[in-house]
């Protein structure tokens, strides 16, 4: 990936622990290093509406800590030192990520999306669609490859 540069000083990568978010974070580390950008990772703990936003959700909090620890390992493997990783609590991930991009004045949000095929076409989920439509900065998608068909 040498020679690829992104015109951004501050990059936000939402992570959720799936393969797509790990792959896109690794790619974002390479982009940030090439572009000399600051990289921010965010994990959103979605709190159900029937619970107070401050509710202790141990399992989700533990999962977030594990995911962010993995993100820091990836950053170290990619020799990127300037990485800020944190978790947020919100009702819905999409608006929380857009607010994070606004509040921290991000130049780009890079999203990893898994390959999904419904009704004959590739689709985005509600979080990705919300970010695409509402983020105040560039939005870049990295989608997994389609699975290789198994030949019988």
Tell what function each PLM region has.
Residues 108-134, 148-151:
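Glycine-rich, Arg-bearing micro-motifs that act as flexible, cationic patches
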Residues 2-54, 58, 77-78, 82-83, ...:
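Small/aliphatic-rich secondary-structure junction motif
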Residues 32, 71-75, 101:
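Conserved hydrophobic residues forming the short capping helix/wall of the S-adenosyl-L-methionine
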Residues 43, 112-114, 143-144:
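Short secondary-structure boundary segments
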């Amino acid at each position: 990936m040498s020679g690829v540069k992104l015109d951004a000083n501050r990059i936000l990568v939402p992570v959720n622990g799936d393969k797509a978010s790990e792959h896109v974070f690794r790619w974002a580390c390479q982009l940030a290093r090439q572009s000399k950008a600051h990289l921010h990772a965010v994990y959103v703990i979605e709190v159900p509406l029937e619970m107070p936003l401050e509710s202790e959700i141990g399992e989700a909090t533990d999962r977030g800590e594990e995911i962010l620890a993995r993100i820091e390992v990836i950053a170290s493997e990619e020799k990127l030192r300037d990485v800020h990783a944190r978790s947020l609590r919100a009702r819905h991930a999409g608006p929380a990520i857009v607010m994070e991009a606004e509040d921290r004045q991000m130049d780009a949000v890079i999203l990893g999306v898994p390959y999904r095929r419904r009704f004959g076409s590739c689709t985005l989920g509600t979080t990705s669609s919300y970010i695409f439509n509402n983020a105040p900065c560039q939005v870049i998608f990295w989608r997994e490859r389609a699975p290789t068909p198994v030949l019988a």
